[in-house]
């Protein structure tokens, strides 16, 4: 029976994303969120490269889970995925306190996974997040290219002082948040540029081992902002 640990799944995710042309990744991130495409890319890679046997298979949207490795009707591995811009991870409100914050999105995925895990306790469960940014400061006319969330990218760069600061701080915030949920791996995505604007992105993968503490939001807030 297939078993994949955190390091193996992270390495397979990294290998699957390396197959994407950096110019294509830049286009995807500049023109909108792309968690669906990245989910499909990972799913295809797992389906091709896992040593599946018998009734084992990879599927999407089983019981509304993003990606699942199954043995017949039994889930073995479940993965949920989200995508956010750097400016979201940079700001305390969007990172933690808003009703539609990164934290709330992650918590919702964790609760859904734990509910399924209660029914299938032998399954391994994971959450993932892509954090990406477009350096709109490199092109004063960025609005001409209809960058999705272009104004938000620009506000984040201005707030952080420059694009490098924005990427670094948002990466640190996302690392702390993910690490609070469980063992975490991170790797950069090889994104190129879009009409002269550099694109940066990171992939975070966390294995959920236990239920989050009731005070987790405050613990994350204290770790980052206090």
Please identify what each model-predicted range represents.
Residues 83-144:
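Catalytic cores of nucleic-acid endonucleases
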Residues 13-20, 42, 46-50, 110-120, ...:
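Hydrophobic, Leu/Ile/Phe/Ala-enriched alpha-helical segments that form helix-helix packing faces
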Residues 2-11, 98-111, 202, 208-226:
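Ampiphathic alpha-helical segments that act as solvent-exposed interaction surfaces
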Residues 54-69:
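Long, charged, glycine-rich C-terminal linkers/tails
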Residues 1-58:
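Acidic-basic catalytic patches of nuclease active cores, encompassing PD-(D/E)XK
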Residues 67-69, 73-89:
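Conserved catalytic cores of phosphodiester-cleaving nucleases, focusing on short active-site segments
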């Amino acid at each position: 029976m297939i078993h994949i640990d955190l390091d193996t799944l992270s390495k397979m995710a990294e290998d699957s994303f390396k197959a994407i042309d950096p110019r294509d990744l830049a286009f995807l991130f500049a023109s909108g969120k792309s968690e669906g495409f990245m989910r499909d890319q990972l799913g295809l890679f797992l389906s091709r490269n896992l040593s599946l046997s018998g009734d084992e298979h990879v599927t999407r949207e089983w019981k509304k889970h993003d990606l699942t490795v199954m043995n017949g009707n039994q889930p073995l591995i479940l993965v949920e995925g989200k995508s956010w811009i750097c400016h979201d991870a940079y700001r305390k409100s969007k990172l933690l306190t808003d009703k539609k914050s990164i934290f709330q999105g992650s918590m919702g995925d964790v609760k859904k996974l734990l509910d399924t895990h209660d029914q299938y306790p032998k399954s391994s469960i994971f959450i993932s997040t892509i954090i990406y940014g477009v350096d709109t400061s490199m092109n004063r006319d960025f609005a001409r290219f209809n960058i999705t969330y272009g104004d938000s990218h620009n506000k984040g760069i201005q707030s952080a002082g420059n694009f490098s600061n924005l990427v670094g701080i948002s990466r640190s915030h996302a690392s702390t948040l993910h690490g609070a949920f469980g063992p975490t791996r991170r790797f950069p995505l090889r994104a190129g540029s879009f009409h002269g604007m550099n694109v940066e992105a990171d992939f975070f993968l966390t294995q959920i081992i236990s239920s989050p503490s009731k005070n987790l939001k405050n613990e994350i807030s204290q770790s980052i902002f206090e």
